[in-house]
């Protein structure tokens, strides 16, 4: 069984992609709606949440974990790899590979929670793959609550996104 966790429902897109790619595999998804958003919490708290989520999924029978939360992956991935003896994947590495492969100018914009941006994980991984890349990072603390509330197509969300993306 594959266990997938996120701080909310955004990781359902990851679960859907895994289900399409591996239809014979059983999945369990844990969206931590009780403690979302993670992005404004301390690294210690985020790591503890990720540890608890991973253990919960293992207790349910998961033999492989996917961290579908950028914030948890950026802060706790190394700890989870050290502490748990099973395959653990995260969403950052494939996103970085796609960004590096897609950019024509060598410029890559990254948006995320404060914790994700402050971890510098995207910049480190992008520059490891493309040493001449220029990375422009922008924290977007209001984005997670808007997405979780289903406000993707609202005028207010578009205004906030324009504001966040203008420096990029």
Put a short name on every predicted segment.
Residues 1-168:
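Non-catalytic structural scaffold of enzyme domains
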